[in-house]
């Protein structure tokens, strides 16, 4: 018997991976908006948490777990390709090597911090969304989406910034950066929440899915359990 492929799930999974890869590349640029200094990755990275909310809400934690691991694998793959490309000798007539290396030649410390923070933050986001859905019997999606994002984004920032920049940037400045990132990412979630609600309702109607994670295993390694 053939297993039906959910088109909305597939499209959200693709968008999730694209957002993660784009965020990693955009992180190399520091921007200033209204006097606040952040990385350009802030433009797209919160979208991955919104997609994670949608997937966990509609298809449950197990499907979210699959997408999170696929995002990790694709990010790792792109990072490795970038490091290989940086290691290869540049053509003598090409003068863009320094700029290319700046974008793709991320230090191992930053790579490890980024991937670890992504895994922990994303899994916490999906877990909180799943458990709160059970506890509330599916009510109060807005509150669940906001709180799961706050938990996930906080964990992500608490792991990434000290792991990537501890000892390089003063701890007081790191703390300020972390607080700003958490606040802005959470505000991002709140501002786009009306769109998220409509998307979730539309997907539930089109796909006919509304999973409650009763009696499942929340072990992050059980990828085959979907």
For each of these PLM feature ranges, what is it?
Residues 1-72, 76:
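Hydrophobic transmembrane alpha-helices
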Residues 27, 31, 78-86, 121, ...:
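Alpha-helical transmembrane segments and their lipid-water interface positions
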Residues 32, 161-180:
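Extracellular/periplasmic helix-loop-helix junctions in multi-pass membrane proteins
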Residues 39, 43, 99-113, 180-181:
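Short aromatic-rich membrane-water interface segments that cap or initiate transmembrane helices
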Residues 84-107:
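Membrane-interface interhelical connector segments
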Residues 135-154:
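Internal alpha-helical transmembrane segments of multi-pass membrane proteins
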Residues 148, 176-189:
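Pore-lining and gate-forming transmembrane alpha-helices of multi-pass membrane transport proteins
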Residues 200-226:
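Short, highly charged, low-complexity non-transmembrane loops/tails of multi-pass membrane proteins
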């Amino acid at each position: 018997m053939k297993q039906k492929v959910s088109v909305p799930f597939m499209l959200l999974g693709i968008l999730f991976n694209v957002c993660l890869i784009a965020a990693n590349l955009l992180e190399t640029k520091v921007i200033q908006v209204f006097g606040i200094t952040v990385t350009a990755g802030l433009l797209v990275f919160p979208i991955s948490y919104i997609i994670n909310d949608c997937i966990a809400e509609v298809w449950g934690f197990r499907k979210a777990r699959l997408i999170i691991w696929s995002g990790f694998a694709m990010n790792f793959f792109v990072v490795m390709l970038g490091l290989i490309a940086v290691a290869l000798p540049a053509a003598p007539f090409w003068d863009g090597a320094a700029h290319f290396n700046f974008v793709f030649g991320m230090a191992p410390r930053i790579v490890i911090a980024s991937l670890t923070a992504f895994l922990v933050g994303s899994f916490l986001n999906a877990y909180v969304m799943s458990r709160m859905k059970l506890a509330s019997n599916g009510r109060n999606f807005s509150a669940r989406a906001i709180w799961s994002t706050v938990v996930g984004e906080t964990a992500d920032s608490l792991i990434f910034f000290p792991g990537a920049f501890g000892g390089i940037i003063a701890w007081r400045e790191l703390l300020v950066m972390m607080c700003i990132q958490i606040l802005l990412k959470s505000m991002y979630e709140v501002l786009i929440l009306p769109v998220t609600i409509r998307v979730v309702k539309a997907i539930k109607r089109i796909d006919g899915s509304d999973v409650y994670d009763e009696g499942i295993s929340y072990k992050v390694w059980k990828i085959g359990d979907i």
